[in-house]
């Protein structure tokens, strides 16, 4: 096992020096605007120095959003990702961006949460100044915004996949493809398609209740994910592309764990579809959204 772990492996057009990979996760080390700052750069560089051959930066949003994750939506952000790629390449470590659409920030949920925070701060200042009336006023605003934001948050996560228009889905697909183009320009080696969240929800018979070409049969429910893959390959043809494939598993008591993904039998069929569409690698994961 150890000898295999340290052997090189070819995936798509990339050769990894070994099989040690750092999987995607949200570190919280990014700057407030989602940029890759000194703390993020140092964290990932240490992993590369330690011998890791492949690092996937998790939850990179291709749009401006309040989501506390990395972001790459503007040409001006390319340079910071180039610095990251250059730093990791110095240690013969490849780097990928895991792209996802922050569906829980649909139509300004994040803005409502931020405005609630501001009102809360104003309430605290008024209270400290013994201005009871102003404190109560701002606290009421804070409470109402918070309640409304989280009600909308719950609705969006549960229903956006079914309610989104084809135009919305097309815009999201295009933003992901353009993000991949920017990543390629920055010298990033690969793209991981986040198959959980929005894409997993579209694939899921538990969450997808659409009646158009994106709902119903397995072919329809997986159509959008395959369109996203094709859009990325067209926008960034030199990049290796992998897919995070979430599996809905069955608990010992018979209940299901996860909703945004596919049950095992459908997942096998979808993996074959991905292979036929030209995917380079599949990362199998537990469905958890």
Named regions from a protein language model:
Residues 1-289:
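Flavin-dependent oxidoreductase catalytic cores
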């Amino acid at each position: 096992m150890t000898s295999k772990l340290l052997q090189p492996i070819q995936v798509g057009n990339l050769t990894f020096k070994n099989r040690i990979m750092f999987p995607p996760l949200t570190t919280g080390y990014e700057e407030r605007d989602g940029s890759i700052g000194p703390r993020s750069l140092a964290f990932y560089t240490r992993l590369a120095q330690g011998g890791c051959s492949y690092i996937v930066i998790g939850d990179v949003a291709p749009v401006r959003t309040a989501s506390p994750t990395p972001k790459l939506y503007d040409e001006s952000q390319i340079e910071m990702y180039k610095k990251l790629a250059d730093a990791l390449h110095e240690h013969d470590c490849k780097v990928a961006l895991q792209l996802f659409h922050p569906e829980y920030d649909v139509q300004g949920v994040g803005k409502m949460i931020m405005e609630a925070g501001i009102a809360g701060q104003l309430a605290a200042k008024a209270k400290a100044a013994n201005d009871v009336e102003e404190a109560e006023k701002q606290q009421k605003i804070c409470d109402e915004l918070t309640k409304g934001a989280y009600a909308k948050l719950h609705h969006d996560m549960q229903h956006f996949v079914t309610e989104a228009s084809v135009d919305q889905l097309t815009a999201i697909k295009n933003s992901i493809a353009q993000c991949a183009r920017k990543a390629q320009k920055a010298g990033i080696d690969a793209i991981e398609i986040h198959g959980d969240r929005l894409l997993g929800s579209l694939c899921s018979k538990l969450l997808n209740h659409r009646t158009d070409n994106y709902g119903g049969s397995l072919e329809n429910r997986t159509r959008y994910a395959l369109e996203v893959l094709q859009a990325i390959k067209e926008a960034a043809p030199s990049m290796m592309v992998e897919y995070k494939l979430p599996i809905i598993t069955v608990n010992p008591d018979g209940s299901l764990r996860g909703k945004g993904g596919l049950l095992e039998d459908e997942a096998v069929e979808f993996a074959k579809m991905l292979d036929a569409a030209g995917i380079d690698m599949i990362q199998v994961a537990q469905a958890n959204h």
